[in-house]
Amino acid sequence: MGDLGFLSKLLDQVQSHSTVIGKIWMTVLFLFRIMVLGAGAESVWGDEQSDFTCNTQQPGCENVCYDWTFPISHIRFWVLQIIFVSTPTLIYLGHAMHIIQQETKLRARLSSPGGSRLCKQPKYTNEQGKVKIKGNLLGSYLTQLVFKIIIEAAFIVGQYYLYGFIMVPMFPCSKKPCPFTVECYMSRPTEKTIFIIFMLVVACVSLLLNVIEVFYLICTRVRCGSRAHSHKITSAENPASLSSPRWPTVEDSLKQNKMNMELETSQSIGGSLDGAKEEKRLLSH
């Protein structure tokens, strides 16, 4: 199973660009799919065709019956399942890496001389380069989750229609060139059934984690939106709490001008009265 090594290295980079549930999904994928499939599948399914026997001597009958019973090997089916389920995640990884690269260049321009005049600011990463899943990145993340759910469910249904979930020990076969309905036998059917059920349970857990993560992201988004909306309402009802200064209106300016004129008039009248009193005092002397 060395062909999955490169895929494992790529998926390992997704850990830093995922939610907590996404990290759990990656753990399930690595431990219970890639590692178990690589360690135990070959020993369990290595004799799948060599020990498939039919009670006939007709040349070609066993090969035809095996091909009819197993259109695709279980191992190859599960490898394809891992690759197809991981593809949306790898596409999201490419999108996230592109955004990180763009914002790294933007931070370099902002730190350069004259960069403070730039209006655009980094949106998806912080100073440490940690990705914030929001905006277009959130849409990309939700899209890859939806595609993983669809692909996972399709492979589970496909496995049921191709093989079923139980490996029976005997298969009747009447395909040509078999001269009659022959009976074909599979080695170690119980062990293979246990392995099939295990891989099915892991696929269902993976599907459930993807569904939970979709609801988690949607609920988090709705909660953040409601907080922002309530903050706007509170600020509108209590203007004094706003940090920006309150600019005077036209009505305020007119009131201020009227008060200034009244003050000047009262000061001029007061000055005239004081002058008349002083003149009268001098004449009396």
From Swiss-Prot:
Residue ranges that the UniProt entry lists as topological domain Extracellular: 41-76, 172-194
Pfam families the record matches: Connexin
Keyword Endoplasmic reticulum part of the UniProt annotation: no
InterPro entries registered for this protein in UniProt: Connexin, Connexin_CCC, Connexin_CS, Connexin_N, Connexin_N_sf
One GO molecular-function entry: gap junction channel activity
Gene Ontology annotations of biological process type: cell-cell signaling
Annotated region described as Disordered, given as residue ranges: 264-285
Cellular component terms per the entry's GO annotation: connexin complex
Stated family: Belongs to the connexin family. Beta-type (group I) subfamily.
Function of the molecule: One gap junction consists of a cluster of closely packed pairs of transmembrane channels, the connexons, through which materials of low MW diffuse from one cell to a neighboring cell. May be involved in ovarian follicular maturation.
Protein's name in the database: Gap junction Cx32.2 protein
